Amino acid sequence: MKKRLETLLRSALERLKTAGDLPADQEVPLQIERTRDPAHGDFAANTAMLLAKSARCDPRRLAEKIRAALPEDPAVIRTEIAGPGFINFFLDAIAQHRVITDIHSQGPGFGRSSIGAGQRVQVEFVSANPTGPLHVGHGRGAAYGAVVADLLEAAGFDVHREYYVNDAGRQMDILAASVWLRYLENCGEVLPFPANGYRGEYVRDIASDLYRTQGERYRTSADQVLLGLPPDEPQGGDKEEYIDAVVSKSKNLLGPERYREVFNAGLDSILDDIRDDLGEFGTHYQEWFSERSLTETGAVERALERLKSSGYVYEKDGAQWFASTRLGDEKDRVLVRENGQTTYFASDVAYHLNKLERGFDRIVNVWGADHHGYIPRVKAAIQALGGDASKLEVLLVQFAVLYRGTERVQMSTRSGEFVTLRQLRNEVGKDAARFFYVMRKSDQHMDFDLKLATSRTNENPVYYVQYAHARVCSVFRQLDEKGWARDLGRGMRRLERLCEPHELTLVASLSRYPEVVEQAALQYAPHHLVHYLRDLAAEFHGYYNSCQFLVEDGDLRDARLNLIDAVRQVIANGLGLLGVSAPETM
């Protein structure tokens, strides 16, 4: 209905342009919102106030001109001018009821649109280092990124979901060294484990698998490993210096081939686990993009040459720097260290050049909130590469804190392992985890109440919404038990019988659903859809508790059944976009 009114307004404004009441080149701002007070109609437009200055006309007088130029439409009973120049639209109840027919005919497609016009959008999300299992912090980014991608797709965008695999660099070398040291323990070697190594049980598991499948292929004596190493932190040394020395020793003792085998054993095991974990969470990707491939294909070197040719690279203290301050960053960034090694940022520059070259109309990065300071340097790099930095949208996700009732849950074990996404999912289920993760704006702090998420009460929002869907299904089971059948066509012809306050409220809410999906997609804001579904469920539960559906009056019964079936369909559609199931029984 909102789109229909926009079309009417646009026609009226074109008529005023033709009549000379508006400049011919006047941009047409269309802002139509639902009214909060029914006394002010169903929709209101502030178009006259926005155009008054350029039209050199009093807003109320211009509103009258617009109103007079509006084409007739059977859905609009009347229009009124209110306040400083609002145009209020009063709609025919029967016309509003047609949303029930639309929902029935469109089914799962109701709420989808073509506003994105097929624009290609890449959504990169999670992209956690493959150095350990995903934890609950990654879970929020996974749920948020997946829903944003699904919403954009529902709005007509061509969405490409991508995970950037950080399979190169120092952290991966530390993982490989950690796996190797645990492997040596399996071989019977006794040696201290680095203070800065990866200590999780998953490292022991990878090492045990390596020993079981490869025997002692990678064995070296503990004496050879420890020879010449600096002191670790417990001995008064520097843990960073120590772990770097261990990595270097691992590479030297194993040699390139065997080191790469150990490296890949750790990477492949953890990456397989991440893929499985996200798949079970309902999160899927079109592409898993390897950071290592950027170096192996020469993409990093090519990106650096492009920055140099644009005049944004200089040398200082033996290193190569990106002059990002010239493009708004707070300080310049190192691209190549004095030892000749490229930085993580250099790989990121190459990765974003790759994104630009793939021709996406929009690039959406979902990052942890701690990466906020990283945004200016990446935008600066895109600009220096000759790209359009405005194509990049960075969406920040705050960490989630777990509670059980009022008691805060310990987020990590003694060895520093975080509560994993899999542990959370096993406790509360995929549906609750997905729903709770997107209930609030992504950049807002989030308290995740495990006790609430597993409760079967109206206070649990996901249960409350799913229960509304199940309740509708139960009504249709009761219909079958009575030996009755719904006459869908008769119900559609008798929609005027839906005149109770609860019914009119539900009809108005159902007609809002496409607008909510569009808003949630364009604003990257899944919480709008969550709030809508909670409100719709509340309205339905109120209707369920106050009205009988299976009445003797066949016309009224079928009209009401069509209404609640429309509610069921919209709830199912909305939950589907959130990656949450719509159960028929609970």
From Swiss-Prot:
Q: Which PROSITE patterns match?
A: AA_TRNA_LIGASE_I
According to the UniProt entry, what is the EC number of this protein? 6.1.1.19
Describe the reaction catalysed, as an equation: tRNA(Arg) + L-arginine + ATP = L-arginyl-tRNA(Arg) + AMP + diphosphate
Q: Where is this motif: 'HIGH' region?
A: 128-138
State one molecular function term (GO): ATP binding
- Compartments, record wording: Cytoplasm
InterPro entries from the UniProt entry: aa-tRNA-synth_I_CS, Arg-tRNA-ligase, Arg-tRNA-synth_N, Arg-tRNA-synth_N_sf, ArgRS_core, DALR_anticod-bd, Rossmann-like_a/b/a_fold, tRNAsynth_Ia_anticodon-bd
Pfam families documented for this protein: Arg_tRNA_synt_N (PF03485), DALR_1 (PF05746), tRNA-synt_1d (PF00750)
Q: Which GO terms describe its biological process?
A: arginyl-tRNA aminoacylation
Q: Which residues cross the membrane?
A: none
Sorted alphabetically, the keyword list is:
Aminoacyl-tRNA synthetase, ATP-binding, Cytoplasm, Ligase, Nucleotide-binding, Protein biosynthesis
**GO CC field:** cytoplasm
Q: How does it assemble?
A: Monomer.
Matches recorded under HAMAP family: Arg_tRNA_synth
UniProt similarity note: Belongs to the class-I aminoacyl-tRNA synthetase family.
| Protein name stated in the entry | Arginine--tRNA ligase
* Species of origin: Methylococcus capsulatus (strain ATCC 33009 / NCIMB 11132 / Bath)
Q: What is the lineage of its organism?
A: Bacteria, Pseudomonadati, Pseudomonadota, Gammaproteobacteria, Methylococcales
